[in-house]
Amino acid sequence: MKKGILGRKHGMTQIFDEKGEVIPVTVIEAGPCVVVQKKTVETDGYNAIQVGFGDVKEKRLTKPLIGHFKKAGVPFKRYLREFRLDDISGYEVGSEIKVDIFKPGDRVDVTGISKGKGFAGVVKRYGANRGPMSHGSKYHRRVGSMGATTDPGRTFKGKIMPGHMGHERVTIQNLEVVKVDPELNLLLVKGSVPGPKGSLLIIKDSVKSK
């Protein structure tokens, strides 16, 4: 059965395996999450569960959200996300989803909002080549040619240009779960994941796992 959970990034560290080799891991506080709503094909056109994560005070929520949580009879949560699943019979409104749904060796996809870098040029943003750095050249880190003149008389879509870099939804696929700590609600995955410390992460079964 497919599964997913919400979590919060704590940062990176390293652990040692049985052979004494160093494994870089990201520490994620995953769950506990609570099922706030079940969506079915009959009522909504698709099967999904809506889960909440992170406690929050009532005064920080809008009236529609307060009513949504009270109708479900669950505590107020800061984050609400949906997981589309083929089979939702194993979930009930109010039930908890904990980190022990995963085990070491599982493969997961982790989605988050990448770190924002602010306004950046094409060299930093896309890795564009520089211009000549000497011999009187006045072109070093600029965009370069943006197209012809009369024909076509415009800049084509997709042309790399300076702009806001980062702060985008990014998914890192097929990360290995190295360790699970149910007591501390910690999930250790091999490698890095998007976002700064404390940011929200969505952890799902990997779509590429065999």
Curated annotation (Swiss-Prot):
InterPro entries: Ribosomal_uL3 (IPR000597), Ribosomal_uL3_bac/org-type (IPR019927), Ribosomal_uL3_CS (IPR019926), Transl_B-barrel_sf (IPR009000). This is Large ribosomal subunit protein uL3. One of the primary rRNA binding proteins, it binds directly near the 3'-end of the 23S rRNA, where it nucleates assembly of the 50S subunit. Transmembrane segments: none annotated. It holds the Pfam family Ribosomal_L3. It comes from the Bacteria. The gene is rplC. Keywords: Ribonucleoprotein, Ribosomal protein, RNA-binding, rRNA-binding. One of its GO terms (biological process) is translation.
